[in-house]
Design a protein with these regions (language model features):
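Secretory pathway targeting signatures of secreted, lumenal, and periplasmic proteins
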Residues: 42-82
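Mid-chain, structured segments of secreted extracytoplasmic proteins
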Residues: 71-110
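Bacterial N-terminal signal peptides
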Residues: 9-19
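N-terminal "mature-domain start" segment
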Residues: 23-54
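Surface-exposed amphipathic alpha-helical segments
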Residues: 153-200
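Short, cysteine-centered beta-strand-loop-beta hairpins and adjacent loop/turn segments enriched
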Residues: 67-70, 127-136, 167-169
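Bacterial N-terminal signal peptides that target proteins for export
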Residues: 1-11
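Signature of long, low-cysteine stretches enriched in small and polar/charged residues
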Residues: 99-146
Length: 200
């Protein structure tokens, strides 16, 4: 399996962020983060985790009352360990978005680079079954950075925030995004990411 295929298999930031299945048991903490994540003065609780391969970890956090698959705002952390380069991870995601945009014009994205980190701001959507209307619009701001955890393990970390609108609320979503787009970008960029200890 070449590097590109390997990254694609465990791609950081999958399209329509959560295609996650509900977990009936308490989610496993893989990244050594104690308790909640406080983002923009709001507490997010660990709601779902996954460790499908030996070098990939994903954790999703929701506010109380939201559920996976029907959230309004979600915070996520993903890590791929090993010698993968940050620019390769971002490039795979951008390539994915370009392919989706070819058949879905609403898809849009922009990247920003600063201090060795990369931020990706992108918009995706999902249509109703008949294809006539938008059923979900999802805006994501992802922040990629190289890390070394407490035990010396190297990897690429993604910290991201996803915002969704459904059905009739989509009409209000776009004007609000236009007026306040950089608010979320600045918040994600300034967020102090918790110290990570990757599970062995």
């Amino acid at each position: 399996m070449n590097l590109k295929n390997k990254i694609t298999t465990v791609l950081l930031g999958l399209f329509l962020t959560t295609v996650s299945f509900a977990q009936t048991a308490k989610p496993t903490e893989y990244l050594g983060i104690a308790g909640q994540i406080l983002f923009d003065k709001t507490s997010y609780n660990l709601a779902w985790t996954s460790h499908p391969t030996d070098n990939y970890y994903k954790q999703e956090y929701l506010v109380k009352g939201d559920i996976i698959g029907k959230f309004k705002k979600l915070v996520l952390l993903e890590i791929i360990t090993g010698k993968t380069k940050l620019k390769d991870v971002v490039a795979v995601k951008v390539t994915e978005l370009k392919k989706i945009k070819a058949s879905s014009p609403i898809v849009n994205y922009e990247t920003f680079e600063k201090d060795g980190e990369v931020m990706l701001d992108f918009l995706v959507s999902e249509n109703t079954p008949d294809g006539k209307y938008l059923s979900i619009v999802e805006r994501n701001v992802y922040r990629y950075k190289s890390i070394i955890d407490k035990n010396g393990r190297k990897g690429i970390l993604l910290f991201g925030v996803s915002e969704r609108a459904y059905g009739d609320d989509i009409d209000k979503f776009f004007p609000n995004l236009k007026a306040h787009r950089f608010d979320l970008i600045n918040l994600v960029g300034a967020f102090e990411i918790p110290e990570i200890t990757i599970a062995k």
